[in-house]
């Protein structure tokens, strides 16, 4: 069979997503503990529930969209610098996403526990869960930073054989390390706010952090200061750390009022 290249990669991704959905449907349908989750045929859409879901979901969607857009705009900036910086950016985004998903898993778990404690009015454990999740995230980040630092050459070489691209990726890794603290903070406390259903300000804080802080600084560092690809990535720690502190102070203020 003839190699399909990028088109084949797209087909493989589509198939994996379809199989994942099918697997989840089968698990929910067959396992007894998910019996209550099975939808009834007679169950129709409930307007008041739809409104509540939109009220909670839209700010979260906008917050996540703004964060993702800041990375996408940075990709455009890297493209202006040339194909080699753009390739390096894509490799770093892949490495960054892996680390993000690990920490995000802890944040998502914290969100579930926080919502349970909120439901029974146990605000002491709401606070403790958020703080514990943050420190677990920091511990995981330190482990990942150590592993990436030790194995950075073989890790980057898995993606490309181009020495030029490898060199640029290695120059971006310190920027990636710098923003891990802020990223962990914003992941943890954004999820904590979701757990207590306080999401309205998430999109405002995301707009401030990514649109007003991160993207302009990436441009200034890269093209006005002349730092190139490193400059693009140096804007990210400022945006993510700003988001982290804004989410943290919002969470703390909400907890104090309750």
Where on the chain are the PLM-derived regions?
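Hydrophobic faces of transmembrane alpha-helices in multi-pass small-molecule transporters and flippases
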Residues: 23-26, 42-73, 77, 98, ...
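Short alpha-helical transmembrane segments in multi-pass integral membrane proteins
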Residues: 1-58, 114-179, 221-258
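Small-residue-enriched core segments of transmembrane alpha-helices in multipass membrane transport
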Residues: 94-95, 174, 207-216
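Small-residue-rich hydrophobic transmembrane alpha-helices
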Residues: 75, 88-152, 183-205
């Amino acid at each position: 069979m003839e190699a399909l290249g990028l088109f084949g990669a797209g087909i493989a991704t589509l198939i994996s997503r379809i199989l994942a959905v099918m697997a989840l449907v089968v698990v929910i349908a067959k396992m007894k503990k998910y019996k209550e989750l099975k939808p009834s045929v007679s169950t129709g859409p409930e307007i008041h529930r739809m409104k509540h879901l939109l009220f909670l979901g839209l700010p979260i969607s906008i917050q996540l969209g703004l964060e993702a857009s800041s990375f996408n705009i940075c990709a455009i900036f890297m493209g202006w610098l040339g194909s080699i910086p753009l390739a390096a950016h894509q490799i770093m985004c892949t490495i960054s996403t892996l680390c993000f998903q690990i920490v995000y898993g802890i944040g998502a778990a914290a969100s579930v526990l926080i919502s349970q404690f909120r439901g029974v009015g146990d605000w002491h454990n709401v606070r403790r869960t958020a703080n514990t999740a943050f420190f677990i995230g920091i511990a995981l980040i330190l482990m990942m930073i150590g592993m990436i630092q030790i194995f950075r050459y073989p890790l980057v070489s898995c993606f490309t054989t181009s020495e030029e691209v490898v060199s640029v990726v290695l120059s971006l890794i310190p920027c990636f390390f710098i923003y891990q603290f802020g990223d962990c903070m914003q992941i943890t406390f954004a999820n904590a706010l979701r757990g207590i259903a306080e999401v309205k300000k998430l999109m405002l804080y995301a707009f401030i952090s990514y649109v007003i802080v991160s993207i302009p600084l990436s441009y200034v560092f890269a093209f006005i200061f002349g730092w190139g690809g490193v400059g693009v990535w140096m804007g990210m720690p400022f945006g993510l750390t700003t988001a982290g502190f804004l989410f943290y102070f919002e969470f703390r203020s909400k907890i104090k009022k309750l």
